[in-house]
Design a protein with these regions (language model features):
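Rossmann-like NAD(P)-binding element
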Residues: 1-4, 11, 19
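Adenosine-phosphate binding glycine-rich loop
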Residues: 13-113
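Cysteine protease catalytic core and zymogen-processing segment of caspase-like enzymes
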Residues: 2-6, 26-27
Length: 113
């Protein structure tokens, strides 16, 4: 997605971008390039490492012993992971913008611990 497309979607009422498996912005940078940064400053952008954590979380869940292996249990675990991540971002930044920047800063701090 390029800046002009983001601007067009914003003018049509876009409020949220939930990134999928790959960063959707036409940036050379993997994390928060100029296009992603522009969108993050204009609308709520949920970064791919939160929005698309499902399969990684399912694998982690299934590696546990003595757990229920049902659609409901797996969905509940993934939903809880996403909800907790967004709640953590909201504690640091209760704004509707700069969600990706805040989430990335939190993730980097955790990795550096």
């Amino acid at each position: 997605v390029q800046d002009a497309q983001v601007k067009s979607m914003i003018s049509a009422g876009l409020e949220v971008i939930s990134c999928g498996a790959n960063v959707p912005f036409a940036d050379k940078e993997i994390f928060l390039g100029p296009g992603a940064e522009f969108a993050d400053c204009e609308v709520s952008v949920i970064p791919d490492f939160i929005a698309n954590c499902g399969m990684a979380r399912v694998f982690r869940y299934l590696m546990n012993d003595n757990i229920p292996i049902t659609d409901e249990a797996i969905f509940k675990d993934v939903a809880s992971c996403i909800s907790n991540a967004l709640a953590e971002v909201y504690k640091v930044n209760p704004s509707k913008i700069n969600i990706s920047r805040t989430a990335l800063e939190i993730a980097i701090k955790k990795l550096l611990k």
